Amino acid sequence: MNLFTPLMLTAMFILLLPIIMSNTQLYKNSLYPHYVKTTISYAFIISMIPTMMFISSGQEAIISNWHWLSIQTLKLSLSFKMDYFSTIFIPVALFVTWSIMEFSMWYMHSDPYINRFFKYLLMFLITMMILVTANNLFQLFIGWEGVGIMSFLLIGWWYGRADANTAALQAILYNRIGDVGFIMAMAWFLTNSNAWDFQQIFITQHENLNIPLLGLLLAATGKSAQFGLHPWLPSAMEGPTPVSALLHSSTMVVAGVFLLIRFYPLMEQNKTMQTLTLCLGAITTLFTAICALTQNDIKKVVAFSTSSQLGLMIVTIGINQPYLAFLHICTHAFFKAMLFMCSGSIIHSLNDEQDIRKMGGLYKPMPFTTTSLIIGSLALTGMPFLTGFYSKDLIIETANTSYTNAWALLITLIATSLTAAYSTRIMFFVLLGQPRFNTLNLINENNTHLINSIKRLLIGSIFAGYLISYNIPPTTIPQMTMPYYLKLTALAVTIAGFILALELNLAAKNLKFMYPSNLFKFSNLLGYFPIVMHRLPSKMSLTMSQKSASMLLDMIWLENVLPKSISLFQMKMSTTVSNQKGLVKLYFLSFMITLALSLILLNSHE
């Protein structure tokens, strides 16, 4: 166990070498991406040793290196928490990043700033490591903000495109909302338990934890793109494909789920928060699965499937199974990163074409990418004995045992069948049928960087689930017998989704596409959410301020109150004065009659 700490720290601090090198001449060298990739591969190999040691001994460690400051009883120091979650997650993150870095060497080879791109990706990985291994809330917050800012920089990588800039801004703004919740939780823990260390927070008895846990749930909603704060994730697809593969599938977006997993000792006592988490996850997983059904951008379909899987992880936390949620995080990282890399390979080969309606018949020119995409899609749907099966099947089985939450299970099952449907749709549109793209495109996937990186993740997508699930601690549910129809539920709904998609595909091939239905519009326009949330408030505030400015100031004050009121007053007076017709005889006669009458009256009085 003596080597556990130094090896883990070596694996983490070795990643700083390429960042330090960025001030030297090596940073200007074209081999810099190669150095970064090699560093990450070495870090992965080193990190596997302490992980194996942890699996064999099961002994957690807390490494405190450097004390920073003390405020009353609050002690802030640089400390790393090496428990089950961090020791398993670090090799997974390093393995996936290693493959993505190698893929980036092929995908971004013509980019003039490729060295800076690799440095950004590496900085992102380091901040993710800080987040995962943090032992106190302050350190976790540094990692949390770090992944947020790196996400912003990498989504807006092609800053010449307006869409990329707005997408980056959208990501940072939605995450800001989540950060408010995080800071609120930090402040609550500081004032109530006077501690930011996880151990102290967990052992302190608290009366009512709803407020801090709500803050943490809001933070997770922002970072993990849950319903309400979800629109930034599909927009983030404006960034380069390696960014989508690393940040928006395998590592950064699971940070929110990871935060809730970290705080599971507080969550498991609080039924209110569990119910809220369950509701949020169930709504997200269904809504995003519905949205994925009709999208035409290949990356957006994969992005929505990511959001749907994140919803499934949140559901798992809601039924008080943090270890299962963590298992799904680890298994999901492999096949989702591979799906993004396959779509990146297709996009790059078809000269940056992302519309699946303009693809088709790619199984002949791109056999390796096709194989990987199909295996990745099957792993995503939870086909038996691929990686996704080990976590997804367990989650649905566990949910089956909770009869109180049957509605959440039902929604999750519908989302699972829809997962199979949109995966099949991608396979049909992209890989099978006749080519619908420009035949002049030079399709070539025989590049070692591309093949090796996808091959590694392909092996992970087949075997990783078995290896990780074999080492998961026993969950709170004891081994029990189960009727076979409950046991086969997950598989049954997945197969139903496949059959449904096959039927729909045949119908779509043979029938003419008429005017889109309202349901199609709802799915295609993302449930009208961006329109309502992004366009409507700004339009309403603009029209309201315009109306108040034009009506109140211009019309009422500057027109009616001062100039028009004076003119109206004078007009009334002048009309009264000048209301004479010029009939002199009549006036004279009336004057004479009045005079005569008054004289008669005066004389008669005398």
UniProtKB/Swiss-Prot annotation:
Name of the protein: NADH-ubiquinone oxidoreductase chain 5
Family per record: Belongs to the complex I subunit 5 family.
EC number(s) from the headed UniProt entry: 7.1.1.2
Pfam families xrefs: NADH5_C (PF06455), Proton_antipo_M (PF00361), Proton_antipo_N (PF00662)
Membrane-traversing stretches: 1-21, 43-63, 88-108, 117-137, 140-160, 171-191, 209-229, 241-261, 273-293, 310-330, 366-386, 413-433, 457-477, 488-508, 513-533, 582-602
Record note on quaternary structure: Core subunit of respiratory chain NADH dehydrogenase (Complex I) which is composed of 45 different subunits.
Principal cellular location given in the protein's record: mitochondrion
Phylogenetic lineage: Eukaryota, Metazoa, Chordata, Craniata, Vertebrata
InterPro entries: NADH_DH_su5_C (IPR010934), NADHpl_OxRdtase_5_subgr (IPR018393), ND/Mrp_TM (IPR001750), NU5C-like (IPR003945), Proton_antipo_N (IPR001516)
Membrane topology classification: Multi-pass membrane protein
Reaction(s) catalysed by this chain's protein: a ubiquinone + NADH + 5 H(+)(in) = a ubiquinol + NAD(+) + 4 H(+)(out)
Keywords: Electron transport, Membrane, Mitochondrion, Mitochondrion inner membrane, NAD, Respiratory chain, Translocase, Transmembrane, Transmembrane helix, Transport, Ubiquinone
Domain of life: Eukaryota
Cellular component GO terms, alphabetical: mitochondrial inner membrane; respiratory chain complex I
Job of this protein: Core subunit of the mitochondrial membrane respiratory chain NADH dehydrogenase (Complex I) which catalyzes electron transfer from NADH through the respiratory chain, using ubiquinone as an electron acceptor. Essential for the catalytic activity and assembly of complex I.
Enzyme kind, highest EC tier: translocase
Molecular functions (GO terms): NADH dehydrogenase (ubiquinone) activity
Compartments reported by the entry: Mitochondrion inner membrane
GO biological process: electron transport coupled proton transport; mitochondrial electron transport, NADH to ubiquinone; mitochondrial respiratory chain complex I assembly
